[in-house]
Amino acid sequence: THSASSAASDVYKRQKMYCDRISKKVINPKPKIKIKKISSSISHIDANNSIGFVAADLGIKTAIKHAQKTGIGMVAVKNSGHYGLSGYYAMQAVKKNLLTLIFTNAPPAIAPHGALKTLFGTNPICFGSPTGSKIPFILDTSISMINRGKIRVAARNNRSIPAGVALDK
């Protein structure tokens, strides 16, 4: 799993992006978030274009409450944005001795094998499980071969990236 310092580093690196999105009114800095309880185990959150951290934190806390009451908690969040590292939220559930599965969509950034156009998002996927020891199992990954941050750093520093992981046409 990611350490607290790598999570903080991720936020720091993306700070300009968040500020730009607030100034362009993509992120609502004063959202009116609505939680609709579908059943005792399921809720739907309309995050009103809040910054993703706020929505994801509310989502995992709501799912944890449901799971503690009924044995399962499912929450869908819409109208939200980038929320950082999925493993951070999975860890919250794991600390409560709960299994967790977190996934999200992302805009097209990945081309299928042999294609010249992006079709799939990076679509992060995260699984967390208590292990019976102090160290939980957290798998925080995506369907891409390399994350965009590494590509951006390589471009900024005029370095190459591994062959076959990005389109250059």
Indicate residue ranges for each PLM-predicted region.
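A generic, well-ordered mixed alpha/beta core segment in the N-terminal half of proteins
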Residues: 42-132
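Single conserved hydrophobic/aromatic residue that forms the stacking wall/gate
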Residues: 1-8, 12
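Alpha-helical scaffold segments in soluble metabolic enzymes
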Residues: 7, 17, 21, 62, ...
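Phosphate/diphosphate-binding glycine-rich loops and adjacent basic-rich segments that engage nucleotide
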Residues: 109-169
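Acidic side chains
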Residues: 6, 44-46, 140
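Generic secondary-structure boundary/loop-capping signal
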Residues: 15, 19, 24, 30-32, ...
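Active-site cofactor/substrate anionic-group-binding motifs, chiefly glycine-
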Residues: 10-64
